[in-house]
UniProtKB/Swiss-Prot annotation:
Protein name: UPF0352 protein CGSHiEE_07850
Record Pfam families: DUF1414
Transmembrane residue ranges: none
Alphabetical list of NCBIfam families matching this protein: PRK13689.1
Family listed: Belongs to the UPF0352 family.
């Protein structure tokens, strides 16, 4: 999703590939996969981001996701 990142493509690819492997292992259909990923994002926001920044970060993430699917 992000065009510029402080993380390497290799780091991101390794994590994404692991996450895809888990979803495939469980034969998760698209809707279940999206629910699981949404729950993961919500959990990360509520456990790792100060409450004062959560909504703005969630909005930025949402905008980035929307832009990513528009360009594909």
């Amino acid at each position: 999703m992000a065009q510029h990142s402080k993380y390497s493509d290799a780091q991101l690819s390794a994590i994404v590939n692991d996450m895809i492997a888990v979803l495939e292992k469980h034969k998760a259909p698209v809707d279940l996969s999206l629910i699981a990923l949404g729950n993961m994002a919500s959990n990360l926001l509520t456990t790792s981001v100060p409450q004062t920044q959560r909504e703005a970060l969630a909005q930025a993430f949402s905008n980035s996701l929307i832009n990513a699917v528009k360009t594909r």
